[in-house]
Amino acid sequence: MKVRLSPLLFCLVLLLGLVSGCGGAAVREDGKISVVATVFPLWDWTRELLGGGAEDKLSLTLLLDNGTDLHSYQPTVDDLVKITSADLVIYVGGESDRWLEEALAENVNPDLIAVNLMDVLSDRLKTEEIIEGMRGREEEDDAYDEHIWLSLKNAEVCCAAITDALARLSPALSEALAENRTAYFARLEAVDSLYRKAVDGGARNTILFADRFPFRYLLDDYGLSYYAAFAGCEAETGASFETVAFLAEKIDELDLPAVLTTDSPVPRLAETVAANTRSSDAAVLVLDSMQSVTRADIEGGASYLGMMESNLEVLKEALR
């Protein structure tokens, strides 16, 4: 979904850029460097890299903290203020961040650092694919899959780029950042090894989603195959009878123990597909794409690695 700035917000960006450009982005009341990350995984990576000793030097803000999906997000005036007054902006890139790139293009602050992680991952990007049984998108172009964070291997590459940007902003933190990066890489690699072990020990190598499919990066990392109702960025998720029938038949054909869904509070499509299998006993499981994380979730202890570990347990069940 392409999100663009409205004419009114576009004019506001110009005004905010002129104001922030006059004073310099680093000059603010609390004297802290301002870092903004658009979505939860990016925010949590940055939090881990900063560790616990940087609160007096940097403030870290999560832009989408109310559960709004990246693809349906509409920026507010407050969001634009945060972006244009930041010292560092970390974002995914892609069509859903078109509005942000428009805002950055009009920002006259020469010191602002912007890290586009799809640029960082340019040689690892994948296009959204339309496979058998999946309803195609209305757009004709081969859009890149924006769900880059669902690969632990991508996470390492992104964290390296974020570390470099933070060190540029605050050279005094360089040593601590390097230590935190090394420690976090070890944790990422440990979970990656658990995924590999689970996939190698699984009874099958195909899973099925009765939902949008944002997990291509994750499944490709471990050589897994899939069927799904819709592509990852598909806005409309009303399935046809043909889609339901195809997915139900695939569950029967491959003897799959589960049908998966993503973050949906009411997984009606998954339940319908499961009910239309021969045995009607396929479990409905949720694999979390981390697109709807709220401030309350974070206060409750949500973390990127914790959610990847929870997803691993779901994947084990789907591959048994």
Describe the residue ranges of each PLM region.
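Bacterial N-terminal signal peptides that target proteins for export
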Residues: 1-9
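Bacterial N-terminal signal peptides
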Residues: 9-18
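Extracytoplasmic metal-acquisition and chelation regions
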Residues: 17, 22-320
